[in-house]
């Protein structure tokens, strides 16, 4: 979804993990070893994300959520583009670049408008950790429960720009289908799960969402 806005991807062709080793930047071990180094890396991701703007697809989703309150957004992206487009309720499976947390005191700090971190340490003296699901981390259980609940209850499920191979997201289409949902895939590239969808679109998300929903907004 965000690649269409120009946000660098992590796993895709030419993605960030082709240039950097996640073992040095995106795991708790790396953070313990060199927190400033890890924070520098994520600060750069924030700065790069702020150079990009939400595209028409993000704005259509926000408009749908505003008009139809039962519209749910579940994302694996950590760049905050949905919120910057105006969406209020976003289930973030992998956390957010824009939140920092103090694991010692359980505090959360969020800022969607500033690339550089306002503070790198909590008032207690501990380094603040990006509130992101890193490699080797466990997903937040309540977030997963929330996501699976709304997906199991939906009547229309749209997968946008994801390979669908990372769990639990890999099982979301089948969960939605089991509940009777019509399932649509929007992805320029064929995925391993494409054959499971009722409709498949190989065009940019903004273009497809405009065609599907402009008449409803």
Predicted features by range, described:
Residues 1-217:
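Conserved catalytic core of sirtuin-type NAD+-dependent deacylases
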